C-alpha cells in the first residue's frame, strides 16, 4: 500500500521529470513543490518508492526518474486532464473535415495529421483490411467504347477504382441498370463472400451482360490485392526526434526501424474501442520498452472500424496528450457517425 505522502512526492517527481527531462533529487522537490516536509524526509520516501518499483536511478545521476510502474500509477490515480486552450479547441473543431463530403480514409488521414501536430508525437493509424469490409455500392461508368470505370465503395468509406475492358460498352441507361443490379446482389457481402454461387446468380440476373460481370469481379479482386491485412500508416515520424531520449543514434535507429515495420506496429496497438495507455514494460515488443502508446478506436456509424494511436517516449505530458486525444476522437467519431 502506498500512502498519501508517497503519492504526493511521486506526483511531484513525475511532473518535474516530464517538464525538465532531468533526474529529480530530494532537494529539488523540497524547494519547488512545498510539500511541507524536509529534504531528508523526501529522500527517505524516495528510497522507499524506489524499493517499491515506482522510481529508478539512472547510472550517471544521483537523482531519480519514474519507472514504467510509476508512470502507470500516475496515469491511473493521479492525473488531471489539462484544459485545452480555445485555440486548440477551435483547431480540433475546424480541422476534421465534413464527413458527408469526404471519404473516410481522407478524414482519418486529416485527423492523424492534426493529432501529430497538436501532440508533437508520431501518430499511427491501423485501419481494417478491405477484404473484411462490406460492399456498399458498385458503379460502372463509360470511359470509351470498350472500357468501363468500375468504382467500388465499401461500408467503411474505402473507394477503389479500376478500368475493365469489354467487347462493347452498353449505353449509359443500361450501365446504370447493371450497376444497380450488381450493387443489390453484392451489397453487405465482403469481398471474400463473393463466391461462385453469388457470381452464378448475378450472371442469371444480368443475362446478356455476362462479359461485364466476368470482367468486373476479377478486376475488383486485382485492385484489392495486397489489402488482406490491416493497413497501417504513420504521420509525423520525424516528431520522435523532438525528444532527447532519441538523441542517441542507436535508440533513434531502433525506434525508426520499429516504426517502419508495419507488422510489429500493428501488434503494438490495442484493438480496444476505449482509450488505452500502454507504458514501457507493458509493451511486449523489445524495441518499444522505453515507449508509451496511447490508442483509441474510431467508428463509422455503429461499426468499430480502426484504431488511432500516438507513440513517444515514456516521458510525455500525459495530462495534455490525453486531453487532446479525448477531444479529437470525440470530434472524429461525431463526424463519422452518419457515414
From Swiss-Prot:
Q: Quick check: keyword Membrane in the entry?
A: no
Q: Where are the transmembrane segments?
A: none
Gene Ontology molecular function terms on file: DNA binding
Ordered alphabetically, the record's keywords are: Repressor, Stress response, Transcription, Transcription regulation
Indicate the family of this protein.
Belongs to the HrcA family.
| Role played | Negative regulator of class I heat shock genes (grpE-dnaK-dnaJ and groELS operons). Prevents heat-shock induction of these operons.
Under the heading HAMAP family, the entry gives:
HrcA (MF_00081)
Name this polypeptide is given: Heat-inducible transcription repressor HrcA
Q: Name the source organism.
A: Clostridium perfringens (strain SM101 / Type A)
Q: Which gene encodes it?
A: hrcA
